[in-house]
């Protein structure tokens, strides 16, 4: 998959160093993945939440952080829409961000 944008993740882990290792691991896995359907994601990330319109929420560091992405399965592109703490996540609408 093509992940847009690594810079978003880097900026976040510079501010929240506790999230760095797991965000780096997620990025490496996503970059090497070939997800064609939401079921492909659930096979690897059982605790991921599949939302409407291609949105997926990943739990990072045991759900301390949340990563929201929009996936264009046909094009093989993952767009990072949000990364933040669970508390910050509770203040957004993951289906529209």
How would you name each of these model-derived features?
Residues 1-64, 72-79, 86-97:
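Basic, Lys/Arg-enriched alpha-helical interface segments
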């Amino acid at each position: 998959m093509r992940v847009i944008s690594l810079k978003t993740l880097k900026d976040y882990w510079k501010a929240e160093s506790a999230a760095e290792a797991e965000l780096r691991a997620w990025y490496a896995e996503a970059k090497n993945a070939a997800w064609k359907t939401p079921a492909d994601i659930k096979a690897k990330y059982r605790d991921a939440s599949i939302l409407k319109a291609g949105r997926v929420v990943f739990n990072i560091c045991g759900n301390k952080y949340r990563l929201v992405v929009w996936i264009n399965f046909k094009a093989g592109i993952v767009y990072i829409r949000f990364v933040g703490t669970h508390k910050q996540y509770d203040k957004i609408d993951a289906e529209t961000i």
